[in-house]
Amino acid sequence: DFRCPTTWSASKLYCYKPFKEKKTWIEAERFCAKQAENGHLVSIGSAAEADFLDLVIVVNFDKQRYRAWTGLTERNLKWTNGASVSYENLYEPYIRKCFVVQPWEGKSKWYKADCEEKNAFLCKFPKPH
């Protein structure tokens, strides 16, 4: 039975880790890819996964003031792991290209951000079977 590395948080199928170091979106995606096989910026496939990530975020970031890259870009609305968007949690007014999660009323919401901005980020990789 595969165990996530000690500093990573485990769900049934995936390992997750937030990084406070600030990077542009593409720098963060490249960094996540180096962390593990099939590593990417986080994709969020369901409300349950979003709730799990909120717990990971609260433990690792200042829950009032975080801003962290996800693997979603506006260009094709696909996650960096190739998955189509099956669940959305968007906050509308911002029109840019890449997406961050940041707090809104105690939960993480998705906001558009300039891909060149430097932000913290969340990595994810699937547990090998």
Swiss-Prot record:
GO terms for molecular function: toxin activity. This is Snaclec rhodocetin subunit beta. Residues 3-125 form the C-type lectin domain. Expressed by the venom gland. SUPFAM superfamilies: C-type lectin-like. Disulfide bonds join C4-C15, C32-C123, C98-C115. Potent inhibitor of collagen-induced platelet aggregation. It acts by binding to the integrin alpha2A domain and blocks collagen binding to integrin alpha-2/beta-1 (ITGA2/ITGB1). The gamma/delta subunits mainly contribute to this activity. It is found in: Secreted. Heterotetramer of subunit alpha, beta, gamma and delta; only the gamma and the delta subunits are disulfide-linked. Alpha-beta heterodimer and gamma-delta heterodimer associate orthogonally, giving a cruciform conformation. This heterotetramer may covalently dimerizes thanks to the gamma subunit. Its main location: secreted. InterPro entries: C-type_lectin-like (IPR001304), C-type_lectin-like/link_sf (IPR016186), C-type_lectin/snaclec_domain (IPR050111), CTDL_fold (IPR016187). Belongs to the snaclec family. The lineage of its organism: Eukaryota, Metazoa, Chordata, Craniata, Vertebrata. Keywords: Disulfide bond, Hemostasis impairing toxin, Platelet aggregation inhibiting toxin, Secreted, Toxin. It holds the Pfam family Lectin_C. GO terms for cellular component: extracellular region. It comes from the Eukaryota.
